[in-house]
Amino acid sequence: MRLCDTDIERYLDDGIISLTPRPNNDKINGATIDVRLGNSFRVFREHSAPFIDLSGPKEEVSAQLESVMSDEIIIPEGEAFFLHPGTLALATTLESVKLPANIIGWLDGRSSLARLGLMVHVTAHRIDPGWEGKIVLEFYNSGKLPLALRPNMVIGALSFEVLSGEXKRPYSSRKDAKYKNQQSAVASRIDEDKE
C-alpha cells in the first residue's frame, strides 16, 4: 500500500523513514515528498573509446569506465550545472534517505521538468528496502536547449510503499550492495556485478 501524506509525515516524525536534511511538511503532497538537487555531478568526458563491452572481463570493463567518466564535479551554491541536449549526467539528491526493511521507495521526476526534456532517472527509480544514502539521479536532456540545474532546486518526488513483510535481504545487509551509503554521484559499478 502506498503511503499518503499523513502517513509520510508520521513515518518521518517517528523516524521510520528518514530524510536528512528533513524537508518541511509543506513539501509533502498527497502521496509524495519533494526532494532537491544536491551539488555532486559526474559526466562522460571526451574519449576515444569506441564502446564499452558490458559483458567483457571485469578488469577491462573497469578500465573502460574509468576512461570515460569524469571525476566528481562539485557545483558551488548559487551556480548552475548546464546539461546540454543529448547529454547524460549523474547527480545526487540533496537529501540522504534511509528506509527500513519493510518499505520500498520510488523516485519520480517532475512533470514540469519533463516537459522541458529533462529525464531525472533514465531507468533506476526504485529505492530498495534497507536503503541508506543519497539517491543518484541519471539525468538526460532530450530537449533542444541546454538546461541550467542548480543545487537545492526541487528535482523530483519520493513515494513509499509498505511491503507485505520485512525483506529477508534488505539493501543495507547485502554484501554485494554496490552503492551502499553513497553520498556522491557514484559512477556505474557494473564491473562489480556477480558472475
From Swiss-Prot:
Segments forming a coiled coil: none
Annotated active site: 138 (proton donor/acceptor)
Keywords carried by this UniProt record: Hydrolase, Nucleotide metabolism, Nucleotide-binding
A Pfam family of this chain: DCD
Ranges for region Disordered: 171-195
Protein role: Catalyzes the deamination of dCTP to dUTP.
Stated family: Belongs to the dCTP deaminase family.
Matches recorded under HAMAP family: dCTP_deaminase
Record NCBIfam families: dCTP_deam
Protein name (record): dCTP deaminase
